[in-house]
Amino acid sequence: AALSAPTAQGLLYEVDMRLRPSGRQGPVAIALSRFARYQAEEAWTWEHLALTRARVVAGAPPVCAALAQVITDVLSRPRGPEALTDVRSMRRRLAEAKGEGGPWELKDGAGRILDIELLLQTGRMLTPGVQAVSPTQLIAGLAGAGWLARDQADHLRSHLGQLMTVQQITRLALAGPYDPQKGGPGLAQFLAEAAGCTDIEALGARLAADSTKAAAIIETVLGDDA
C-alpha cells in the first residue's frame, strides 16, 4: 500500500492493513456511514480503546467535523460492567504473551508504558467528559474527573514520563533494548543524569520499584472479576 511505501528514511508509515474491520478481504477506505455503524454495532472493546487515540488530521472540513462527531459519540455512550471485564481480560492476555521482563523492559510488563496507556484509554472510554488524547492530558483530565485519585495520577505521570525519557534516549542511542552491561559507561551516566539518579543501578532500581507501584494502582483502579 502507498501508506507503507519504502523511502530513503524507512517506511512512510507502518500500517497493518490486516487490522481494518473487514480484514484482508475488505476495502482500505469505507464510507463514513459504514464506519459509524461499525463502531456503534460491531466494534469490540479493544477497538474503542484504540479509538481514544484517534485524531482527524486532514480532509474536507465537513467530513472532518462529521468524523470527529462520530468518534465523540462512540466514546460518549454508556458502558456496562462488561467493558472493565474486557479490559482486565486483555491485560491478562498481554501479560501472558509478553511476560514481565527486567527493569530495562520499558514498554511491556506490569506498570510499564503499555500497561499505563491501557489504563488511560480505559479511563477515557469510561469518562465521556474527558476529551484529551495525550497521556499527560489524560492523566490530568481523569484526575480532575475523579476517576483517578490525585496521588495515583501524580505517580503515573511521573513514572510514565520517566519511562518515556529513558525509552527516547535508548532508541536514539541503540538499535535494540538497553543492556547496562553492554551500553557503555557514557550512555549509563547520561541516562542516570537524565532521570535524576546517582548511577545506572539506582535508575534500574527506581524503574522496578515505580513499575511495581504503578501496577498496583492499575489493579486497584480496574478492580477484579470477583
Show which residues each predicted segment covers.
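A nucleotide- and high-energy phosphate-metabolite-utilizing enzyme signature
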Residues: 1-226
